[in-house]
Amino acid sequence: MPGQITYLDYNATAPLRPEVIRAMTDVLRCHGNASSLHGPGRQARSRIDAARRDVASLVGAKADEVIFTSGGTEANNLALRGVKAARVLVSAIEHDSVLRAAPADNAIIPVLPSGIVDLAAMDAMLGETDTPTLVSVMLANNETGIVQPVAQAANIAHAHGALLHCDVVQAAGKMAVDYTALGADLLTLSAHKFGGPQGIGALIVRNGLEVTSQMRGGGQERGHRGGTENIAAITGFAMASVLAGNALPALMVDMSALRDRLEDGVMSITPHAVFFGRDQQRLPNTSCFALPGVAAVIQVMNLDLAGIAVSAGAACSSGKVARSAVLSTMGVDEALAGAAIRVSLGWATKAADIETFLTAWAMIAGRVNLRQAG
């Protein structure tokens, strides 16, 4: 990484893969509007069509189910605002782009202390009325990495005649995602979480389901999203999707081993550290833990001074550091939630990066112990 930074914040954004940079650079040298009928326009359209197939393949969807957007936030907004539903249910641990896109009168599905969505509560909430309902449950939480029982949630939703939207932004490229097996009606993706460029994402929409455009204009994306397509970003998204899909089996094994080494090392250095979701199915790259008595911002800043990049909770709040709402929803004590950090690995993480982190962690723990002893 530039400047010898040890980057362990992949859940915030992943470094661009070199192959993605090359693919995008090649396209940036070309010109042509995909809506034009001449040669350059047809070439641009061909690139988009090929990219649509590659992105769909990553999650087992069909190419004509892919709607390109400016990212996960826009895709989530399109799903929650574009689907006709008199009622919206969202899980309490959803990304802010889901929680804030939902209507003001939406209902919140509670989460168990384990970090898993309360399916019994969801079932009961759906049974309260027979009005058209949209349910939104993410596949993997961005802070804890805990994987949610989306297929079960979809079965419950469909049994009540409801639709299910699933945000897989954090999961894609880090675990296998099968659109059909999940049973979701809509799926949100974002390229920059697995080595693609920022500013490009997609909403997968089941064939036959109507979604009203929230971006009016020239009728691109089959009328779902107006505006000239960002062909370079779409090409980068596609290349990242192909690379992620090909590398996934080995990457999952490698990331799990590195994460386990990280957590074992942290426990050895600071036995009083508290891990969240360690007894649940998690993303293989994500570790969320707290050092009691030491604010998350202090930990993050000290690690930053040591040249290591990690996060205090989610990284989508304009640089603000606040107590984790996800952990609070799980019933975690306020002080402990305020001491939680997230370490997330990715395609370029090496064993040496974990050892660098643990060396810095030992130094930070030593300073904390000295202050407490004094």
Mark where each language-model region is.
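Pyridoxal 5′-phosphate
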Residues: 1-374
